[in-house]
Design a protein with these regions (language model features):
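Short amphipathic alpha-helical segments at helix boundaries and their inter-helical linkers
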Residues: 74-77, 166, 170, 262-279, ...
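Conserved C-terminal helix/tail region of periplasmic/extracytoplasmic solute-binding proteins
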Residues: 284-314
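Pocket-lining segment of extracytoplasmic ligand-binding domains
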Residues: 81-82, 152-153, 159-248
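Sec/Tat signal peptide C-region and signal peptidase I cleavage site
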Residues: 17-21
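Short, glycine-/small- and polar/acidic-enriched structural segments
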Residues: 22-167, 171-177, 190-196, 200
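Secondary-structure end/capping motifs
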Residues: 214-291
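Bacterial N-terminal signal peptides
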Residues: 5-15
Length: 314
């Protein structure tokens, strides 16, 4: 637990700095467009409005994030899929709301690859156990391409994947904004955007432990409300959302615009059971297993439904 605390202490990205407010810590894997609503909520003061002093913590390792959540080192996580294997084994983690309801990844390939079937015999960069591996396998399975038809190369991180493509080590990789656009500017091409294929897949959200939900329901609802406001504002105010990416993530404006356009239609604070099931299938495919629990056992949409109704949203 001391190691987890040390990791978290070195990973805090940004906070509201709201003196007198109730501290809240929420973890996300990386500065990715799928977590944009959480950052918009920070920028627009939605956490402050709820009396919360929010710290958004970057924890790249899903296992570490889950351990930190279960150990009360953090209060919430913004991911949906990475914690599922732990949930299937009995971890008390509950999905409360959604930020992005479609995968944000694009399959980026060398110019010679024109169709998904052309991936046969190619080397694909992946991060084993992560969402890129799950998404890659889901795409290949949908197109009836088996693992034997491709070669997976373990390359964690987007920038190293792009470098590996430039060096000819791999010919394809699943990349999220802004890395996909950066790769395209470097001469590669977007073969397919997974959001166009998997149109209801709960990709990022808000989750907490059942213990926290039971013992601090109003605290949880305030956090849900802040995130829901972030999702709605991100969807309805493109320029604000783009400016957050430029300011906080140091994106070039054209990169931020491309990233926003890819994600805008998938901004929805209320997950569907089907969407969570599809994400569970992604995780199961990546681990070569099957989901061990029905998703309704680890979803609690009471707060998000109440908040959406209170805010007058459909």
């Amino acid at each position: 637990m001391r190691l987890i605390a040390t990791l978290l202490a070195t990973c805090i990205l940004i906070s509201t700095g709201n003196l007198g407010a109730e501290p809240v810590r929420a973890a996300y894997p990386s500065a990715n467009v799928q977590f944009l609503p959480a950052f918009v909520a920070l920028e627009k003061g939605f956490y402050k409005r709820e009396g919360l002093d929010a710290e958004l913590v970057s924890v790249r390792n899903a296992v570490t994030a889950v351990q930190a959540l279960l150990g009360n080192q953090i209060h919430f996580i913004f991911s949906v899929g990475p914690q599922m294997p732990s949930i299937w084994e009995g971890s008390d983690i509950i999905l409360l709301a959604q930020q992005v309801g479609r995968p944000t990844f694009s399959m980026i390939v060398t110019p010679d690859i024109q169709r998904v079937s052309d991936l046969k015999g190619k080397k694909i960069g992946v991060s084993f156990g992560g969402s890129t591996f799950a998404g890659t396998k889901a795409l290949l399975e949908l197109n009836k391409i088996s693992d034997k038809d491709v070669q997976y190369i373990s390359i964690p991180g987007s920038t190293p994947k792009i470098a590996a493509m430039q060096q000819g080590i791999i010919q394809a990789a699943l990349l999220a904004p802004p890395s996909d656009y950066i790769a395209i500017k470097a001469g590669f091409r977007r073969l397919v955007n997974l959001a166009d294929i998997f149109k209801d897949t709960s990709f990022s959200g808000l989750a907490a432990t059942g213990k926290t939900i039971k013992e601090q329901p109003q605290f949880v609802k305030r956090m849900v409300r802040a995130v829901v406001r972030g999702v709605i504002h991100t969807r309805d105010n493109p320029q604000d959302a783009i400016q957050v990416m430029v300011r906080h993530w140091r994106m070039e404006r054209d990169v931020a615009v491309d990233a926003y356009q890819l994600v805008r239609e998938s901004l929805n604070p209320v997950p569907t059971e089907k969407g969570v099931e599809l994400m569970a299938q992604w995780q199961a495919i990546a681990l070569n297993t099957k989901p061990k629990r029905p998703v309704k056992e680890y979803m609690d949409l009471r707060f998000v439904n109440e908040v959406v109704a209170e805010l007058g949203q459909k």
